[in-house]
């Protein structure tokens, strides 16, 4: 799913106004897993220039780490790989792909669905003629296209959310895939704007009346 539109606004999470990634993370952390009705969704969050973070309960993280160790055949554990992901966005997308593969293997025994959230997708996967793209841009487009095209991923329980101001900003080899849907986040209406102003005034000891402070 590509979330477009008003993605850089602040959103009320029930307690405070927070960025969209934080809002989504809190909302999805309260949802039960559709298959188990007990374990929640494991969130994997990638924000540009930051390391990938995995959000879930201890059992979910341990399951994922255990499966990673079996599948990767590497002496480096998942935590070490995650720590390295903030240095290279191409590597980060490759790692997200591998984490989804591990999750599908893990789902044979326990349904720990993943929700992968990727910030600034239009910067990671920019719309441009392939011949004019940098090598790393081309690699990232190829990684995501292969990932989203895998039958096991399309038929599996994991989901990916891409954040971009517009769908057209994401490379067409990704954005035009039939399995990629778009949801536009609208601008706040008058009720939402009033709530924000009232909440801001309350936090800062101010009262707003008829547009005046």
Can you annotate each of these PLM segments?
Residues 1-213:
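ATP/nucleotide-binding catalytic cores
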């Amino acid at each position: 799913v590509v979330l477009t539109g008003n993605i850089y606004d602040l959103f009320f999470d029930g307690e405070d106004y927070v960025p969209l990634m934080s809002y989504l993370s809190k909302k999805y952390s309260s949802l039960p897993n559709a298959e188990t009705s007990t374990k929640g969704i494991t969130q994997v969050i990638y924000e540009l220039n930051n390391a990938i973070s995995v959000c879930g309960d201890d059992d979910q993280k341990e399951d994922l780490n255990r499966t990673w160790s079996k599948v990767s055949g590497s002496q480096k554990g998942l935590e070490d790989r995650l720590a390295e992901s903030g240095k290279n966005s191409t590597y980060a997308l490759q790692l997200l792909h591998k984490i989804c593969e591990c999750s599908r293997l893990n789902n044979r025994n326990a349904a720990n669905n993943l929700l992968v959230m990727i910030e600034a997708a239009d910067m990671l996967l920019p719309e441009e003629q392939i011949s004019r793209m940098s090598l790393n841009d081309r690699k990232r487009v190829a990684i995501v296209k292969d990932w989203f095209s895998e039958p096991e991923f399309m038929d599996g329980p994991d989901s990916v959310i891409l954040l971009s101001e517009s769908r057209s900003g994401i490379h067409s080899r990704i954005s035009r895939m039939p399995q990629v849907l778009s949801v536009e986040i609208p601008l706040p209406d008058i009720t939402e704007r009033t709530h924000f102003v009232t909440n801001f005034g309350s936090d800062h000891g101010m009262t707003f009346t008829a547009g005046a402070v």
